Amino acid sequence: VPNLRTRERIPELMDDPGLDPAEHRRALAGLARLNRFSGSVGALWPSVRALALELKRPVRLLDVATGSGDVPRALLARAARAKIALEIEACDISATAVDEAARETSAIRFFAHDAVRNPLPSGFDVVTCSLFLHHLSEDEAVALLANMAAAARHLILVNDLARSRFNYAAVWVACRVLSRSPVVRFDGPASVRSAFAPAEALNLAERAGLSGATVRGRFPCRFLLAWERR
């Protein structure tokens, strides 16, 4: 297990624009399995549900860096079971990811967008992001958080890996058990080495102007950063 006291950004194979589209799609499927196993939706849903009950109207949600769209699809399914009206849009910088996501459902509008370098469309109640923050430099992460906050009327939620030796070992094993994709098997452990510790994530939120943001650990291997507009 490498020394994880400090962050070490490791270029991930899925970020390579030259990655074969078929291999990219296999990796997206593997990542979706890991998301189901690790409870990405379970981290986000309680806050989304609470906001819906408070607003007493349909909630508009934007999911950023959505990948294959598995997280917003699962949120939509939970909302349907709870009889909560949820209107979702989702974006990703990758055209391959957007095409793959759109193939799975017509109930969510997917679009290509660089959420770090360009402002996000406005008018959303909540803006979410899962497993993307660790791909970014500190300055890029601050820009992303600021863009998310500017687009959100009420709430932003960022669900990401937390850097620790235990989490590195757990992700290494999970990637080999849950996926045969060589991209996932490389990128998973690399992601933990690139990840922020919870205290570092809170510092990024403060730099982005998110006064009152909170960061809480989530089992397994994650933290949830939340900020509510006051």
Describe the residue ranges of each PLM region.
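N-terminal auxiliary segments of SAM/dcSAM-dependent transferases
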Residues: 1-17
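Class I SAM-dependent methyltransferase Rossmann-like catalytic core
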Residues: 17, 21-47, 51-52
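Class I SAM-dependent methyltransferase SAM/SAH-binding core
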Residues: 62, 68-117
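A conserved beta-strand element that flanks and buttresses the S-adenosyl-L-methionine
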Residues: 128
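A short, conserved alpha-helix within the catalytic core of class I
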Residues: 136-147
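Conserved beta-strand signature within the Rossmann-like core of class I S-adenosyl-L-methionine
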Residues: 152-161
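C-terminal alpha-helical "lid/dimerization" subdomain adjacent to the S-adenosyl-L-methionine
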Residues: 161-208, 214
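Core SAM-dependent methyltransferase catalytic element
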Residues: 213-230
